[in-house]
Regions:
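Conserved, short, structured surface segments that act as functional micro-motifs
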Residues: 67-71, 108-168, 296
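Short histidine-centered loop motifs in beta-beta connectors
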Residues: 88-109, 275-281
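Extended, charged low-complexity segments
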Residues: 238-298
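Anionic-ligand-binding alpha/beta catalytic cores of soluble enzymes and soluble regulatory domains
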Residues: 132, 144-149, 155-233
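Generic structural motif
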Residues: 49-57, 109, 216, 220, ...
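Short glycine/threonine/proline-enriched tight-turn/helix- or strand-capping micro-motif at secondary-structure
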Residues: 12-49, 66, 148-153, 186
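Zn2+-dependent peptidoglycan hydrolase active-site motif and core
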Residues: 55-97
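Short, well-structured beta-strand-loop connectors
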Residues: 46-57, 100-115, 285
Length: 298
């Protein structure tokens, strides 16, 4: 059973991604990362609740050891309100140090606490809420096992020719001015694949990605057909349904390899292609051309 996240949930956040994560909980789009804001370096601490409901439990959980993050994360379980779209399910939220406790009633958009940077994060990842939805009889503590998520909003595919000028940088990333959001705040957008759909995921530094907003073609047997996904003529991988298995490929910037390309959905004015490049630095204003090179071309 898939669960649809309505516009009332997603509209509270500036950005989201179903696939841009290395963790199995996101496999098949079974979890979503919700980004409340885009403060400098992505370090906002606001943590608005995705749903109205009653807090069932909060607990501290272990996180992967990283030198830049504490060894613990936090889990918040919420029983959604009976009048809400997720009634009867369990909502689990990670990466929030809770200011709420079991039995507290929260409204949609009300603060759950303070966003934290956990060991689940790569250093280039902005602060966010990790959200999954489960049936009430499922184990809510296991890292994986949440229900597949569908989007109750449309995401506009933006064509991008792979070029842009650097507008912001961090120790591990650079953001380009293209593709630019044509109407910030009005709708979510993302990078368009050559044959349609919106690309989502870490290319290729995470195992796979997603192709959103594209009807699945049907083969002669009536089953969803696999299809090749490309960007600017460069092959990225093969999609089975909406899930992409990346090829053994390398992202290049001005002809030199970088770690990858971060692909997500956004509605804010700061949207642009995000290069993951801890091994390289770029200057603001620098013109960059991004391509994807297959293993056969190395």
């Amino acid at each position: 059973m898939a669960v649809t996240l309505p516009e009332s949930v997603l509209a509270q956040y500036e950005r989201f991604s179903l696939y841009n994560s290395p963790y199995p909980a996101h496999d098949g789009g079974c979890a979503i990362d919700l980004y409340p804001g885009t403060l400098a370096d992505g370090r906002t601490t606001a943590a608005p609740s995705p749903v109205a409901g009653t807090v069932r439990e909060t607990r501290t959980v272990r996180a992967p050891p990283k030198p830049y993050a504490p060894e613990h994360d936090h889990l918040i379980l919420i029983d959604p309100a009976a009048s809400g779209p997720l009634a009867g399910l369990t909502v689990r939220v990670l990466h929030v140090e809770p200011s709420v406790a079991a039995g507290d009633r929260v409204e949609r958009g009300e603060s759950l606490g303070r966003l934290v940077r956990a060991g689940f994060f790569a250093p280039w990842v902005d602060n966010h809420l990790h959200v999954g939805v489960r049936d009430p009889d499922q184990n809510p503590y296991r890292a994986s096992g949440s229900l597949p998520l569908e989007l109750g909003v449309s995401v506009r595919p933006l064509e991008w020719d792979g070029t842009g000028r650097v507008v912001s940088t961090g120790d591990t990333y650079a953001v380009l001015d293209s593709p630019a959001h044509p109407d910030p705040g009005a709708a979510f957008v993302g990078v368009r694949a050559d044959d349609g759909g919106v690309l989502d995921g870490g290319l290729p530094h995470y195992d796979g990605g997603g192709l959103l907003e594209r009807p699945a073609p049907v083969d002669t047997a009536g089953a969803p057909a696999e299809r090749v996904v490309s960007l600017n003529g460069d092959r990225l991988g093969v999609a089975d349904g909406r899930t992409i298995a990346w090829d053994d490929a390398t992202v290049t910037a001005n002809g030199e390899p970088i770690t990858g390309l971060s692909l997500f959905c956004a509605r804010d004015a700061d949207f642009g292609a995000k290069l993951i490049c801890p091994e390289r630095s770029f200057e603001r204003g620098e013109l960059v051309r991004v391509r994807v090179r297959s293993s056969d071309e190395r």
